[in-house]
């Protein structure tokens, strides 16, 4: 009954400019309504009476499903649209910022910013900054910077002088030939590196001294030294110190080896010098095997006992070594003592050799050196016998091949 009374009452919202927007409004509406595209005709008493006669439950059932629709589809205010694409929002936000910055910046600030961008682009790819296309000057500068960076790598100019280990990566054939000539004409590499690589093989001053010698002068000087050999014994008896001929002879030995090695290098560098160097190369290959022993001699064995016997040029004493070597195992320990005395007398017969001048690094010395290098091998068996020395000295040590030559005779050579 209340429903019928309510239906006779006109709706208040109908007098408002927007009209009644409630779909389930039970009041009377004299005007048609359009709510979110849904057209509702004006209300009539007949329909309302039928609804009231059917009972109250149907209108309640119709109101229940319509209430959630009121909350969703009834736009009282303007609709708020939510965007899910965030990239477009960022772009839209940046555009007004740029527009505002253009308005606020003065021309001086714009020019300053452009200059900073050019400087950053010139500094290289370290900053990873790419200039905008509206700057033509930066494009012209970029290729020139790349060319300047590539030039030192192609020419090898960043390599230090005197560094023989680094090799330039890119070279033409003409540049390689020029580089080889200039490196040969320059001063030699550091002497320290030469000693580390095997003992002064690339020492250029020795090679120059050796090549400047005349053969006739070298042979004449060698004859003079051999003629003085007969007076060596008398001079030694008169009180000549035995170390003088030794030290004067040891130094040229190492220099001659260096000179022969440098001459072989000179032959490879300049083929025109083969005629002067050819007779020297054959004895060089014979003496290479004993090179390590010759270099180790002055620093490991400073004593004068057995070392002087190495440089004996007299062939008669070599024959006596062969004779002692054959009868060595058949004799007793007293014979070894007598033989050491014989070795000391042999060293007194050695001709005294003074240190030659710069011109005496000649080819005659080179030819004699291989013969001198053979002496230690023959003398090694006479100077050391393992069984005999162990009988005499129970606490003696065993030595390697290079150490068997000197330590025992130097320790027990004197009475």
Swiss-Prot record:
Q: Which Pfam families match?
A: DUF5571 (PF17732), zf-CCCH_3 (PF15663)
- Biased-composition ranges, Basic and acidic residues, are 220-238, 365-380, 400-415
Q: Where is this region: Disordered?
A: 39-77, 220-247, 346-415
Q: Which InterPro entries match?
A: DUF5571, Znf-CCCH_3
In its UniProt entry, what is this protein called? Uncharacterized protein C12orf50 homolog
Share an example GO biological-process annotation for this protein. poly(A)+ mRNA export from nucleus
